[in-house]
């Protein structure tokens, strides 16, 4: 039987033989299932050759991954903190280098990308223009500092005036 667009149609065994197909008569392991096997000899009896895993990974690696780990860590030391999180997801070699860069470099140096104040650039420019200002820079939402007034000095002046 063969499936056509109209439905099933019976074909003779000669037509199957002409196509190079034949029925398997001995189907003990297959139960009632029928399979077709080509009578033509296959061109390649050997299974496809597997590529070694190191060859496939070498061809797929990027130029950044092919760098030596020490050089890769030095390159990653110049990347911002926020970008390191996305770089971890690239590959295993870059992930290892990111972890090493965090341990050795980012704990001690490289500042974060975002500035702590809204207009920090303007504040820094205004401070550089007027070098006479000795006031400390405070963030915009900092708690109010209580200023302690030395009241004893005021009382001493008043007492001197009163007891003259």
UniProtKB/Swiss-Prot annotation:
This is F-box protein At4g05010. InterPro entries: F-box-like_dom_sf (IPR036047), F-box_dom (IPR001810), FBS1-like (IPR045286). The lineage of its organism: Eukaryota, Viridiplantae, Streptophyta, Embryophyta, Tracheophyta. Residues 38-57 are annotated as: Disordered. Residues 61-109 form the F-box domain. It comes from Arabidopsis thaliana.
